[in-house]
């Protein structure tokens, strides 16, 4: 039996209503899934951002710690350098005073003449030659002339079989910065012995420096070598 128009319309309305309901439920399902995916994605992004922030913080913390260590090390090194410079200034001042006391030593003529004779003898013994040219400061020229005979006499008393020849250089003089003393030259200038007060002071400075440091500043527990 065929349906009436009213029945057909009613069935159509039911179908439309069913389709709408299905569509609504599907839309709701899609919305729910989208919301869940959104929340999952959002949580993922938040977690990644938090991890990135943590990594950045750790990196900056490490850099800050390293910078602090470097700054501390620089300060310590600077302090040590300043202390070392201060100590060196004290030592330099001591030897500077010694140099000032040596200035004008030639004025004590008798004592200086004997001292110069001793220096010439020492230099000749180191030279190992019977013939030597004695170089000195110009201000010491007269004292050297007086000291050479004394030195020759001492040398002959030690080695009577050797004929020593000592001459003072009268044209080419040593610089006043040598503080005094002599330079002996032998074998036509091939051998040279520096027995000036400057050279002797440098030797004393090198040998006495560890003891001077101990006297001035005490023992250094960190120093392994005495130099």
Swiss-Prot record:
Its main location: membrane. It comes from the Eukaryota. GO terms for cellular component: fungal-type vacuole membrane; vacuolar proton-transporting V-type ATPase, V1 domain. It is found in: Vacuole membrane. It is a peripheral membrane protein. The keyword Transcription does not apply. GO terms for biological process: vacuolar acidification. Subunit of the V1 complex of vacuolar(H+)-ATPase (V-ATPase), a multisubunit enzyme composed of a peripheral complex (V1) that hydrolyzes ATP and a membrane integral complex (V0) that translocates protons. V-ATPase is responsible for acidifying and maintaining the pH of intracellular compartments. Belongs to the V-ATPase E subunit family. This is V-type proton ATPase subunit E. It comes from Schizosaccharomyces pombe (strain 972 / ATCC 24843) (Fission yeast). The gene is vma4.
